[in-house]
Structure formats: structure tokens, C-alpha cells
Amino acid sequence: MTPATPRADARDNRARIIEAARDAIAAAAPDEELRLNAVAQSAGVGQGTLYRHFPTRADLLVEVYRHDVDELVALAPTLLATNSPVDALALWFDRVAEYARVKRGVFAALEASVWKDLSAHSRGPIGDAITVLLEAGRAAGAIREGVDAHDVITLISFLTRLDESEWEARARPLLAIVLDGIRASARARERGAPTTNGQPL
């Protein structure tokens, strides 16, 4: 077996650092500062390695957020490949709950100018992912007409405002309510359902 090259090792180290930081942010109490020495230890790298990849705490936080956005966006077509549109959207919303928790932790630790810029740049790709899911749902007659990505982003943005004490009890149930709200009515689903000889399949 060919030994890993230094470049591959560096990529692996970077990925482990990002994952360890993400886990730490998700598990942290409100206002708890991300401890870089703990991140390095959890990732199995030295602090020097961490600082070579991320010279400042802000650099690491920004990369954690960007990584989460990339994963969230890529997940939409992956879920549609193996699930019905409504199930894909429900599973995507489940991932949104995790993303929002990390986003809140990242933004709380960054200067306002930084997180506002990050948020502005992520809205487009996330909106595109939502559009893919909504269009698949409408094509199947499962999502109501007139709902667009901006509507969904507005509805799910409440997650970043939930108190930590309410998170486990409210985040996913509230997303389920959002999903119910954008689904087509039973009558509309029947009209949009595939048919055989005029009868729903």
C-alpha cells in the first residue's frame, strides 16, 4: 500500500480539525468560547498543525460554517436520488436543524461584519438547494404552488432564535410544522398524482 503523501495527510488533518470544531460548537453551552487546544486534541493533531491550517479562531469558525453550508447544499440532490420529494425535504430539514445550531454558535463568536458577509454569501447556494427540493415536490404534486426558496428560508430562520433550553424540544417539531404548511392539500395531491386509466395509482 502506498503511504499517504504529505499533501493527503494535510487534507486529512484539516478535515479532522473542521469536524472536531464543528462537534465542539454543537455541544457547547451558550457563550462558551471554542477552545482551540481542545479542538486540536479531539482532532488528534498538535496545536502547531491546527494553527498552520487556521491561524486564528475566526479562520476556523468561518471554515466550519462554509463546510456546513457546502454539505447542506450537496445533500439535497443526494436525498432526492433515494427518497420521495417530501421525504427528501423532511430529511433535509433534519439536517437544517443541526446546521442552524452550528451556525448560531459560529455567528455568536464572530464579529458582526464577518457573519453578515458569510450569511449573505450562503443564502444563494442554500436557496438553490431548497429550489431543487421544492421543484421536485411540485412535479410530484406534493408541494403547494407559490412557495419559493425565500419563503422557506424565512420560515426556518427562527431556528437561530431558539433558546438553547428549548432546542431539543422545539427545533425539529417546528420544522415538521413548516413542512406540513408547504405541502399540497390532499385534494391537490390527488390531482397531481400519477394515474392509470384515470384512476390514481
Task: Give the label of every model feature segment.
Residues A20-A27, E71, L75-L79, L155, ...:
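Solvent-exposed, amphipathic alpha-helical segments
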Residues A10, Y65, V69, S119, ...:
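Amphipathic, non-transmembrane alpha-helical scaffold segments
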Residues R11-R22, E33, R52-P77, D87-A90, ...:
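An amphipathic alpha-helix adjacent to DNA-recognition modules
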Residues V86-L201:
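An extended, acidic
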Residues G44-F54:
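Short hydrophobic/aromatic patch on the recognition helix
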Residues M1-S42:
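Basic, helix-initiating cap at the start of DNA-binding domains
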